Amino acid sequence: MNYQDTLDYMEWNKTKYEISHKPPKPNFNIYYNCIYWAFLGINVGSEQNKHRPVLVTRHQPNPSICTIIPITSQRLNDSYSFHIDLENFNGTVMVEQMRVIDIRRIDKPIIVNKKTISITQNDWNKISQQIISLYSMKPLPDSEQESPKKVLTTV
């Protein structure tokens, strides 16, 4: 770890401490399919981190957590099917990075014309399709003779 990484990590720990001592409920409403700023922290490898836009996809049954999908701050315009360039926001939803966070990580809504930005029906359809594709369980093997397909590599 270099000096700058150490400073970034120390700054994130300070921010995380402040987040953990915020009131349990934000002073704004959190709506499904809307875009907010959230603190995702300092993460490992390719995990999305920092203070970045996120799409809230679920906010129940536990009201202290919500499911989010990180959004890039610029459109990626790449060929990955699980990266959806949004119609109403200059960013790309990274469906493969979907996760659950504490609602205290959500900083504030992204507002345009006095309204929290939401996704379009077309965006919703594309994102939904990719969630099903990426996160639905694969069928079990037909017989005990078949072994499950290796997905992750081992050391």
Which residue stretches match the model-derived regions?
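Short alpha-helix capping/helix-loop boundary micro-motifs
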Residues: 19-26
